Amino acid sequence: RGLGDVYKRQVYLQPQICSKTNQLKGAEALIRYCNKNGQVFLPKDFIPLLEEHKLVPLIDYYVFEQVCSMIHKWKMNGMNILPVSVNLSQESMVKTSLNSDLLKICRKYDVSPVDMELEISEHVNEVTEKELITLIHSLKKDKFRIALDDFGTAFANFALLSSNDFDVLKIDRSIVVKLGSDSRTTVSYTHLRAH
């Protein structure tokens, strides 16, 4: 039996607040599974099973479409539209039809790609740095916003950063913790900000 036979998928929006102005600047879409008793399961509880059956891209697309549907409703109600971030798994990143699939969903709900932020982790096993750069360039060409997650955990470096126009750079927590306590980390971070 599939997960959908026992569990209900739910997409939540986690607000993103500007630390300087304390104003809402966007949101990140998160998916959870809930059973009939109301128990909520986090990705770590169900992603391994989905990976085993090669179903992760279906979840990526499901979340993306749910967000597009939400944005369409907001527009119909005259609400101000802020970017919503959707995670892309490495399984989706290697799909040759990714761009066209996402654009098709955007057109279905009359949503502009500029309202969608695609969150890509640089900590992936099936995507080389060259492939990642090519993917980001193509997504940016289609006007999608790009967020690089977990910066500093894999091959993300100044060369990668200079090759791409990221809209958002999420620094890995392990680096943030070291700031101020490790002079080498602080120097590297200062150099990054200068660029």
Question: In which residue ranges do the predicted regions lie?
Answer:
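Catalytic-site/binding-pocket detector for metal-dependent nucleotidyl cyclases
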Residues: 8, 54-55
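Cyclic nucleotide signaling catalytic output domains
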Residues: 45, 49, 66, 87-88, ...
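Conserved long alpha-helical elements within nucleotide-processing catalytic cores of c-di-GMP signaling
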Residues: 47-48, 57, 137
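A short, hydrophobic C-terminal helix/tail in secreted or cell-surface proteins
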Residues: 194-195
